[in-house]
Amino acid sequence: MLSCDICGETVTSEPDRKAHLIVHMENEIICPFCKLSGINYNEMCFHIETAHFEQTTPEKSFETLAAVQYENSDLGNTKLHSTVEVTSGIHSACASNFPKESSESLSKDRTLKQEAFYTESVAESRKYQKSREKQSGLSEAQGSIYETTYSPPECPFCGRIERYSQDMEIHVKTKHASLLESPLEDCHQPLYDCPMCGLVCTNYHILQEHVDLHLEESSFQQGMDRVQCSSDRELAHQLQQEEERKRKSEESRQEREEFQKLQRQYGLDNSGGYKQQQLRHMELEVTRGRMHPSEFHSRKADMLESIAVGIDDGKTKTSGIIEALHRYYQNIATDVRCVWLSTVVDHFHSSFGDKGWGCGYRNFQMLLSSLLQNEVYSDCLKGMSVPCIPKIQSMIEDAWNEGFDPQGASQLNNKLQGTKAWIGACEIYTLLTSLKVKCRIIDFHKSTGPSGTHPRLFEWILNYYSSETEGAPKVVCTSKPPVYLQHQGHSRTVVGIEERKNRTLCLLIFDPGCPSREMQKLLKQDMEAGSLRQLRKCVGNLKHKQYQIVAVEGILSPEERAARKQASQVFTAEKIP
């Protein structure tokens, strides 16, 4: 005879027992106390031991019987019963987590751990019982729906693994007895609160181990924080290095762009000089239909001839302006008390070959045109004519090679020919000194009047022209050459100064940027006062931060020339104020 492992019913054969077991599997598990259903067997056992604690209080080990009711809708009210052995010690450990029977409850984490342990212990008890039945010949057949793979139980407190549940029970009761105890009402058992998480312990040593775990966790977290902090510092350092690299790269790029811009501005970008610029412009005029090809070839031939002989072709020159100014001030001007004019000087304006960079060269041509017409300078300038711009560049290079102004030569790479490099007061001084012309540079390095004006500049030029005469007539034609006037970005030539009846001063200036057609208006017999507007510059019209002038004062002896060449090794200018 065979019996059912679940309800104990006796059957006659093995097939009948299997059919009987299938009926059990199809039935629904129902709580015998509250009719709860819809859960599995382990969950039902846990439900009974927790929700119906008073009805199932354990008496002793392996003597608690939990009656579980199975009901099948097809079989009506048929009731089957099975017994489940539960270790009372494990049950006590689980039950101690509920406040119904205890004045003090353990923490939530410990409660869940013991509940899990209880459920596992119940399952292990059933496995142990089945193992014993199997050894006695009452085990179920191979292929039974209840056959499961056995796994050794593990201690939930220390992780120790035992072969059988009974051994695990003994281990838990002997090694972890204090963890299974729970404080009861009316018991004066001492309690210890964890200062970190509030967990209540009944044993001081357990509390100490628990706190040590907190400290180890805290130490680990601090170590992780240090690692994270170190990583953050390394990342910040890398970001800083990347930012510094980008900043330096951007600064280097800006420096290159600024340097290239300055090179273009000062004609040092290897784009050719006067000849190349003139040819490009004439070719462009032919392309636009503004110049006939025959005219192009004619102008090109004239330009090449002028460069070859080194003499300006005179196509940008206007002569006779000083004489016209003398007539105007003598006969027409009524608001001027006195005017001082330089020696005769020709006006030269910029051409297409030097447009944008040739003002310094054109002003030198004006100054030299005046010196060539002055007998005082005929000896040192004997046989000279007004040179073209490429010839002026060659003359300055010769002065550098002779030893004049080495610093200025270095700044321009010792080369002017074939470039569009600007020249200023220092180059004019160097060239005149090399020609034995005595001159001086005066630097008006800051304003000396209100609103950034330079009244001291006007006073100096007045003294320069009026020093030869006293009680002079209204118009004075002096023997003084014109004055080279330089400021940031441009240069002009001062050919005289007028003093009005209200004692204000106005400079008379030739600008190389003014074309010939405008200058020729000054040659008319009936010249009007409005025509002088382009020449007159009063104090309020000159407001640049700094001005430099080059004034010619005579001829140098060979000794003076050598001394000035030596002095130009460290170039200095006279400063006013």
From Swiss-Prot:
Residues 231-261 have a biased composition (Basic and acidic residues). Pfam families: Peptidase_C78. It is found in: Cytoplasm; Nucleus. Its main location: cytoplasm. Residues 225-247 are annotated as: MIU. Residues 248-273 are annotated as: zUBD/ZHA. Residues 231-262 are annotated as: Disordered. GO terms for molecular function: cysteine-type deubiquitinase activity; zinc ion binding. GO terms for cellular component: cytoplasm; nucleus. It catalyses: Thiol-dependent hydrolysis of ester, thioester, amide, peptide and isopeptide bonds formed by the C-terminal Gly of ubiquitin (a 76-residue protein attached to proteins as an intracellular targeting signal). PROSITE patterns: ZINC_FINGER_C2H2_1, ZINC_FINGER_C2H2_2. The record marks Q486 as: Involved in the stabilization of negative charge on the oxyanion by the formation of the oxyanion hole. The keyword Nucleus applies. SMART domains: ZnF_C2H2. Deubiquitinase with endodeubiquitinase activity that specifically interacts with and cleaves 'Lys-63'-linked long polyubiquitin chains. Shows only weak activity against 'Lys-11' and 'Lys-48'-linked chains. Plays an important role in genome stability pathways, functioning to prevent spontaneous DNA damage and also promote cellular survival in response to exogenous DNA damage. Modulates the ubiquitination status of replication protein A (RPA) complex proteins in response to replication stress. The motif interacting with ubiquitin (MIU) and ZUFSP ubiquitin-binding domain (zUBD, also called ZUFSP helical arm ZHA) are responsible for binding the distal (outgoing) ubiquitin units S1 and S2 respectively. C2H2-type zinc finger 4 is a ubiquitin-binding zinc finger (UBZ) and required for polyubiquitin binding, possibly binding the proximal ubiqutin, and for catalytic activity. C2H2-type zinc fingers 1-3 are required for localization to sites of DNA damage. Interacts with RPA1 and RPA2. This is Zinc finger-containing ubiquitin peptidase 1. It comes from Rattus norvegicus (Rat). The gene is Zup1.
